Amino acid sequence: MSNVTHQPKIGFVSLGCPKNLVDSERILTELRTEGYDVVPRYDDADMVIVNTCGFIDSAVQESLEAIGEALNENGKVIVTGCLGAKEDQIREVHPKVLEITGPHSYEQVLQHVHHYVPKPKHNPFLSLVPEQGVKLTPRHYAYLKISEGCNHRCTFCIIPSMRGDLVSRPIGDVLSEAKRLVDAGVKEILVISQDTSAYGVDVKHRTGFHNGEPVKTSMASLCEQLSKLGVWTRLHYVYPYPHVDDVIPLMAEGKILPYLDIPLQHASPRILKLMKRPGSVDRQLARIKQWRDICPELTLRSTFIVGFPGETEEDFQMLLDFLKEARLDRVGCFKYSPVEGAGANELPDQVPEEVKEERWNRFMQLQQQISAERLQEKVGREILVIVDEVDEEGAIGRSMADAPEIDGAVYLNGETNVKPGDIVRVKVENADEYDLWGSRV
């Protein structure tokens, strides 16, 4: 009679941003390596881990609801992630949670799991883990986290209080991980962090090593090295430092994708000062023009906040004027929402909700028109598209201008002779304010 040992099962809920997703992947990789099974149902699991988000109040609410659901359905719950930094807030609502840890507390999470659900006898056949680790994204793209934390103290944000100051990963480790991802079939690497352009600042851009070669710990050096892997490299969360200018030529040369996700947040110098953000709109417009002169194919994505405390109609009009002038390709807009612990909560002249709503609508109406015009310029042109999914009706993919989850899509109706991860040439036939339609060339 065979000696079959029980393989302990862990349920896992991952909430929030791609940076949190990477943390979840790391925890899951460790659990699978140790022989735990990861299951999709609460009632099958010996325990549930909830990786939370605590960035804005709606995210806090979603996290608390997910914890409650896991407690109701399973009963044994460990909480980690950003909201875990506010243990009292979680305990007040859910006193029966077993353990709570903050973000990137991987070792603590594993220790707690070992305590409540002891490690299984290691069976290498049950716990085979791919070299690139457990990934929660489709096989053809992956997030590459290059640092943790942030040195900025924007008044609307509490990330530094949750994730701490900037800590850059050694550049050799980052490049080795990127190589493993590419060897595993990844076709697109999405570089993420709290502040990608600050990479290496905390270590004074010291020289690291990869494959025995010296490499400077900086965003530009990282991009130069990633370009050698022969896959799409996309930059996210790029704070508008002057040295961002250094990566634009790499985009123009086709070494990394001509795509910049650069959160500008506002255009009124007064509001930017209240936010503790850099505040020269004229300089930013001049830089955008310069970037486009160097790299005409550049796609610019940004995010903005309307209804920030103290925002007047004049401030808001400056923001609309900036949009008209900058003609950004992809834009997200948030109505200011107070976050517990954020400095902006103490500012006078809070904007009424109905005014926030009205300004958000005006903002989106203008930007949708600009985005539609920018996409219309692509009709008739040929572009490269990476395929994300295929069904009997055709394929859906993304151009170099589209990041997963947050940007638009390219629809290839009737094109079934492709598979996810394929990069194909497409002639654009139609466009709206978000998406493109086309046929394979």
From Swiss-Prot:
It catalyses: L-aspartate(89)-[ribosomal protein uS12]-hydrogen + (sulfur carrier)-SH + AH2 + 2 S-adenosyl-L-methionine = 3-methylsulfanyl-L-aspartate(89)-[ribosomal protein uS12]-hydrogen + (sulfur carrier)-H + 5'-deoxyadenosine + L-methionine + A + S-adenosyl-L-homocysteine + 2 H(+). This is Ribosomal protein uS12 methylthiotransferase RimO. Disulfide bonds: none annotated. Residues 8-118 form the MTTase N-terminal domain. Catalyzes the methylthiolation of an aspartic acid residue of ribosomal protein uS12. Its cofactor is [4Fe-4S] cluster. SMART domains: Elp3. Residues 136-373 form the Radical SAM core domain. InterPro entries: Elp3/MiaA/NifB-like_rSAM, Methylthiotransferase, Methylthiotransferase_CS, Methylthiotransferase_N, Methylthiotransferase_N_sf, NA-bd_OB-fold, Ribosomal_uS12_MeSTrfase_RimO, rSAM. Binds 2 [4Fe-4S] clusters. One cluster is coordinated with 3 cysteines and an exchangeable S-adenosyl-L-methionine. One of its GO terms (cellular component) is cytosol. The gene is rimO. Its EC number is 2.8.4.4. SUPFAM superfamilies: Radical SAM enzymes. Residues 376-441 form the TRAM domain. [4Fe-4S] cluster 1 binds at C17, C53, C82. One of its GO terms (biological process) is tRNA modification. Its main location: cytoplasm. Belongs to the methylthiotransferase family. RimO subfamily. It holds the Pfam family UPF0004. It is an enzyme of class 2 (transferase). [4Fe-4S] cluster 2 binds at C150, C154, C157. Keywords: 4Fe-4S, Cytoplasm, Iron, Iron-sulfur, Metal-binding, S-adenosyl-L-methionine, Transferase. It comes from Salmonella arizonae (strain ATCC BAA-731 / CDC346-86 / RSK2980). It comes from the Bacteria. It is found in: Cytoplasm. GO terms for molecular function: 4 iron, 4 sulfur cluster binding; aspartic acid methylthiotransferase activity; metal ion binding; protein methylthiotransferase activity.
